[in-house]
Regions:
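Alpha-helical transmembrane segments of multipass membrane proteins
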Residues: 31-36, 59, 107, 149-153, ...
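Hydrophobic positions within alpha-helical transmembrane segments of bacterial inner-membrane proteins
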Residues: 24, 28-31, 102-110, 145, ...
Length: 231
């Protein structure tokens, strides 16, 4: 007979929450940036430029997210099979690939910042604000790839609580204080520097988390021999 498996529902929910939190943080960060820009001189043009930039940045985000959705089942299978070598191999591949993808996106956006903004708006003032906003948003864009990869990996190894924490740091815990304070002190320049400042802290936290991820995953996979759960 059909009946819901609450354990399975809980597992699926826990796995999906960090990704949902990242999306929520992106939306909150966008709203707070508009609020921070509102009191500034020429606010209308800044907000219009930021709207264009967000569309472009989200394209890059979706590319990375799509790749990570492919990485997660591979890493999960290796972890569930307690194949330590394959798991760490998949982690290394995902790390390199996510960094490569985000670096490529950043390079393209920085080099083509002006033409890309012109695709959406031809107002020279908006184009000028937009190109600098776009450069500032992707200057340290690998932070997004690294953070999302670490979030997915911590989910995979069962440390969903820490994965949830990582999902909040880039556009939440770190970005929000900067976007609420820097524009008040430095005007539009404060908006330009808010994302790079948050990305620097994100990279530091993620780098410090790699060691514990390796220890937790290795300890979990070595705790029960392969095939023991089938006995």
């Amino acid at each position: 007979s059909f009946h819901p498996s609450w354990k399975l529902i809980k597992t699926v929910t826990v796995i999906g929450i960090p990704t949902a939190v990242i999306q929520i943080c992106l939306s909150v960060a966008s709203s707070l940036t508009n609020i921070a820009a509102a009191p500034l001189p020429d606010a209308d043009n800044i907000i219009a430029a930021y709207g264009v930039v967000q569309r472009l940045v989200l394209i890059g985000c979706y590319v990375v997210m799509g790749f990570m959705q492919g990485y997660q089942p591979v890493a999960s299978f290796a972890f569930g099979a307690r194949d330590e070598d394959r798991f760490h191999q998949s982690v290394r591949f995902a790390l390199k690939a996510s960094l490569l993808l985000t670096v490529l996106v950043a390079v393209v956006y920085i080099l083509l910042s002006r033409p890309l903004i012109l695709l959406f708006n031809q107002n020279p003032v908006i184009v000028d604000y937009g190109r600098w906003l776009l450069v500032s948003q992707v200057a340290l864009y690998p932070a997004f790839g690294l953070c999302y990869m670490m979030t997915i990996t911590y989910q995979t190894i069962g440390a969903s609580g820490y994965g949830l924490f990582l999902s909040t740091i880039r556009q939440g815990l770190f970005y929000v204080p900067f976007i609420l304070t820097l524009p008040k002190l430095f005007g539009v320049t404060g908006i330009y520097f808010s994302q790079p400042a948050a990305d620097i802290l994100t990279i530091l936290v993620c780098m410090l988390s790699i060691g514990s991820m390796k220890r937790i995953s290795s300890a979990s996979m070595r705790g029960t021999p392969k095939g023991a759960d089938e006995l």
